[in-house]
């Protein structure tokens, strides 16, 4: 959510910032709505002041036995009371219209974010590791998994339809090992606090992190009105909604390993085979709550934490700075990590780390106060994948494939695999 006061004071800068995200000029319309709202509020305050004054005047008139004046004042008060509900309703309607307009506009990008239309305009910040050097033919993960006998799409479709997967035996264990490795790394070495939180949330939580109102079609909703989380960013960030935090206790760093649920409404025909784009998938999420001064440095730190997962797995990847046309709705700046997949002969996103400024905090009313301050400020929020477990599984299968069709377990995962060093075809 944007600060209407800042927009009033900087209309040209606001429009210029959103123009970088291909948004039409909006400042004039927002300011007009705000002026209307302020006018209605002023009228209400005038009515309330006059009602209070007239009520006192009635008492004075009665004391002076000026019944004619008293009756006239009573009629005036009655008229004000009759008109106030209409004015209050107008205030609610205009405020709702302004808030709805503000809530549908994306965040303003930082100045150092590259301008661009889509993913083709993203900028490579760095490349880490080397592509595998083996000589045998590369295969896609679903070919490997099905040949091993531990990846079953037909039974998944029987149970749930398309974009689901059943993993069994050694691949199920590998998936679990990856998630446990990630959560252990982030809690024991990176300073994040593990959180176990609900997988279903109310409208307010989805609004707070920016999924609502614009992106409802990308979500799953239960019949009683709750939403399945598309990412644990929703629950972890909303932990501080409506709260005033102590600045000296910031940053707060949360992590959770949860299933995520997405309808993939805009992905028809894309990645229909395999595990790349699923309705349900495991992800290790990272969220930081900071003060304004620390947010940019925290973004670099969070991205490094996500990169460390891939480094320890020995995977080749690149880090991109997303352009204005490819960033998420709530982000001011985003780094994407793209892992190398030999079977596809390309890089694919495996993590996205974003700094959101106070955009989400305004929607959630999450604030902090300095030790010697009376006034509060909005917190700054950050979120990132540390990382997507399913896509990490894909990367391990394709990068650690042996010429006999088996898959070597990365060294860092061996403590989680019960003595298993490679995954071989089911007997």
Swiss-Prot record:
InterPro entries: aa-tRNA-synt_IIb (IPR002314), aa-tRNA-synth_II (IPR006195), aa-tRNA-synth_II/BPL/LPL (IPR045864), Ser-tRNA-ligase_type_1 (IPR002317), Ser-tRNA-synth_1_N (IPR015866), SerRS_1_N_sf (IPR042103), SerRS_core (IPR033729), tRNA-bd_arm (IPR010978). Gene3D superfamilies: Bira Bifunctional Protein, Domain 2, Serine-tRNA synthetase, tRNA binding domain. Its EC number is 6.1.1.11. L-serine binds at residues 231-233, 285, 385. This is Serine--tRNA ligase. It is found in: Cytoplasm. Belongs to the class-II aminoacyl-tRNA synthetase family. Type-1 seryl-tRNA synthetase subfamily. HAMAP family: Ser_tRNA_synth_type1. It holds the Pfam family Seryl_tRNA_N. GO terms for biological process: selenocysteine biosynthetic process; seryl-tRNA aminoacylation. Consists of two distinct domains, a catalytic core and a N-terminal extension that is involved in tRNA binding. Catalyzes the attachment of serine to tRNA(Ser). Is also able to aminoacylate tRNA(Sec) with serine, to form the misacylated tRNA L-seryl-tRNA(Sec), which will be further converted into selenocysteinyl-tRNA(Sec). GO terms for cellular component: cytoplasm. ATP binds at residues 262-264, 349-352. Keywords: Aminoacyl-tRNA synthetase, ATP-binding, Cytoplasm, Ligase, Nucleotide-binding, Protein biosynthesis. Homodimer. The tRNA molecule binds across the dimer. It catalyses: tRNA(Ser) + L-serine + ATP = L-seryl-tRNA(Ser) + AMP + diphosphate + H(+); tRNA(Sec) + L-serine + ATP = L-seryl-tRNA(Sec) + AMP + diphosphate + H(+). Pathway: Aminoacyl-tRNA biosynthesis; selenocysteinyl-tRNA(Sec) biosynthesis; L-seryl-tRNA(Sec) from L-serine and tRNA(Sec): step 1/1. GO terms for molecular function: ATP binding; serine-tRNA ligase activity. It comes from Agrobacterium fabrum (strain C58 / ATCC 33970). Its main location: cytoplasm.
């Amino acid at each position: 959510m944007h600060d209407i006061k800042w927009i009033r004071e900087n209309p040209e800068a606001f429009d210029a910032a959103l123009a970088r995200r291909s948004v039409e000029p909006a400042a004039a319309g927002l300011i007009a709505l705000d002026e209307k709202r302020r006018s209605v509020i002023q009228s209400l305050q005038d009515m309330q002041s006059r009602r209070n004054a007239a009520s006192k005047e009635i008492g004075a008139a009665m004391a002076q036995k000026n019944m004619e004046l008293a009756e006239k004042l009573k009629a005036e008060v009655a008229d004000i009371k009759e008109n106030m509900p209409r004015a209050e309703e107008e205030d609610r309607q205009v405020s709702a219209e302004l808030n709805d307009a503000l809530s549908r506009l994306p965040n303003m990008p930082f100045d150092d974010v590259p301008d661009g239309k889509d993913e083709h305009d993203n900028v490579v910040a760095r490349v880490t590791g080397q592509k595998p050097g083996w000589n045998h033919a590369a295969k896609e993960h679903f070919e490997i998994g099905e040949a091993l006998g531990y990846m079953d799409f037909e039974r998944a479709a029987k149970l749930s339809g398309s974009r689901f997967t059943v993993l069994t035996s050694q691949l199920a264990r590998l998936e679990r090992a990856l998630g446990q490795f990630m959560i252990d790394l982030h809690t024991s070495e990176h300073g994040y606090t593990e959180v176990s939180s609900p997988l279903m949330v109310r409208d307010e939580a989805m609004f707070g992190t920016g999924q609502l109102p614009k992106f409802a079609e990308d979500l799953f909703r239960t019949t009683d009105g709750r939403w399945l989380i598309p990412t644990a960013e929703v629950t972890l960030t909303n932990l501080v909604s409506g709260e005033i935090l102590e600045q000296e206790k910031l940053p707060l760093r949360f992590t959770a390993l949860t299933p995520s649920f997405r309808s993939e409404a805009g992905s028809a025909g894309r990645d229909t085979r395999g595990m790349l784009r699923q309705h349900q998938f495991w992800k290790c999420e990272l969220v930081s709550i900071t003060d304004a001064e620390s947010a940019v440095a925290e973004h670099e730190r969070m991205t490094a934490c996500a990169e460390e997962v891939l480094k320890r797995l020995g995977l080749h990847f690149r880090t991109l700075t997303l352009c204005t046309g490819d960033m998420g709705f709530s982000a001011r700046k985003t780094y994407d990590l793209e892992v190398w997949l030999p079977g596809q002969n390309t890089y694919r996103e495996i993590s996205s780390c974003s700094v959101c400024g106070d955009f989400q905090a305004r929607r959630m009313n999450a604030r902090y106060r300095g030790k010697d301050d009376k006034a509060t400020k909005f917190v700054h929020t950050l979120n990132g994948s540390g990382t997507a477990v399913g896509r990490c599984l894909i990367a391990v299968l394709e990068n650690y494939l042996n010429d006999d069709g088996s898959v070597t377990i990365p060294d860092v995962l061996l403590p989680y695999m019960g003595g298993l060093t490679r995954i071989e075809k089911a007997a």
